[in-house]
Amino acid sequence: MEREAEGIPVQGGERSGQETERAADREEDRQPGTERYKTFRDPIYGYIYLEESVVRNIIDTAAFQRLRDIRQTSYAPLYPAALHNRFVHSIGVYYLGQIAFNALVRSAENQKTHSGTGRDINISDLLSEDEWRRCRSLFGLACLLHDVGHAPFSHTGEDYYKEGRSDVPIQIFGDPVYQNAIQDGALSANEQHDIQADLDDGKTYSCHWHLFQLTKDPVFVSSVAEEPAAHEIMSCIVALDTFGGFFLDDLERAFVARCITGLTYIREDARGNIKFGELDADQYDIINKKMLMDCVIQLLHSSVIDVDRLDYIIRDATTIGYQSVSVDYQRLLKGITLVKDSQFTFRLGFHKNAVSVIENAVYAHDNEKKWVQGHPTILYEGYLIQETIRIIEEQLAKEYESASTLFSFDSLTEKGSTFKPKKGLESPGGVLRVSFLSDTDLLYLMKNVFFEKAPCVKEYFWRNLRRHPIWKSEAEYRSLFDKSRRKKLKDAANRILGNDRTAIQINQQLLDSIDEGIEKKKKDNKFPGIPIDEMRKRYCQALLDLLPNNGKDGIVLLSTSFFKSNFVKGKVQKLNILFPGQNRPSTLEDVSGILSGNDDSEKFFYLFYYPGEQGPVAVRDFADQLSKRFDEIDKDFQ
């Protein structure tokens, strides 16, 4: 993305009607006042205008510039041009967010809702002009900062944030807000018990506790806080801590955090339980405002279509060259409207003119998910990175002393994380310090510090040493095994993987480990678990026996899910569509004829191996022999 000079550049020549309309849209989205603007040139949207103060105090800071070194996708092994980053994505989301917000405001000015006074009012009257202006500013910040805490290498390592540790004092448990949340029932007994259990176990830090400390919003220490992705929680923390001067109070900080995480004020399952007839005027107006703020939140983060998802669908396809359907983002976002779904409630929906674009957006997302994200080459690259990160985290904990973990708030900031070798241990990297953690930092650690400790690192850098998948697609897997056979293979794969794992390397070391576990159970008189371990070992040995050199080099089993179209998701089907002149909105399911598909929740797996000098295995013969061997094992353990 190229940054232009201040002001609006003047283009020579005449504009077409479409260009004139787009230029007018950009002028509207810019909302100029006394503030000066900087101009960014985006390859997809053209000129994007941002306030000079936002550019100077947010975009030009090291915390935001870090996003230039965070790759947007993990598609590069398959599509070499997939080098776009979270920096350009974040600015693109900001741009789309302004268009979406303008559409919501226009709709709010024309849609009415029941008020606490007993009369209908325009939804826009729920907020004053100053409140609308402030809401626009905060929503823009949320769009811009929604990925500011994103982990390196796309989503591969972000789960380490959940167990990460930072040198940040947490003092929420004596906080009056926390005590009030308990008294008001905002936290259930189970939620309080879980927090206390963590404290009793000596836990001193949690990213959810940290976010509560910044926002004073109990939702972030409740069970629903587990729903957002780990990078969303961390992005909230980095945004609110690093750019705290942009927020006036806890309510503003909580609103921005809810926009980034998608945690609405009124949960969908609680919406129908509100007894509007029993509310007084003040309570009624509070509920109305919460419904409106929930609509704003869903512009950035929803389960169906939002500006974050829309940008990456368009940008990924454009950048990597993947041929997909066209998504007219202008038509889609300008179709955003508020719709009344009952006498008392309203929600976000779309005008009928946007139906075709909604279908295209879901098609585009489906195509990317099935043919790009689900490609075995990309899945295996993710496995290599995940294994490398796991080993690096283990080695840092084993050989270094630090108040922080690698994947932590500290590592994302200027403060950084410092890792000192433990006494008596030598490290090729000496004292390590990581700040503004990015892809480059992990690559440095992989190449220069932990190269010998993580065998998968060599396989990551030397692509000609990588394992190959035996079957190369979901379609080929289906052709090799019928439905009943797939169920048996899924059960066998689950036994091999064990609990909570999606990938495992099967080799002699794993077989030895299983044997050790069996001997330990015999010693501890835990005989009931032994047959399960023996069966697991037999499955693993059968796989190795079928490979070249009897699997001396090992094999990787990687579990994944069969493709499931977004069209069959309930929330997509129930998306509200407004037709002028109708009292109630329709749903996408009612008006679209394409909402069909097989809700196939089966799991399947890939097997990655080294072909060796003998060349590739005969896939059909391998599949037949695998089925036969597994049947024999199942029969022996019946």
Regions found by a protein language model. Give the residues of each.
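Histidine-centered, transition-metal-coordinating active-site segments
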Residues: 1-141, 148-638
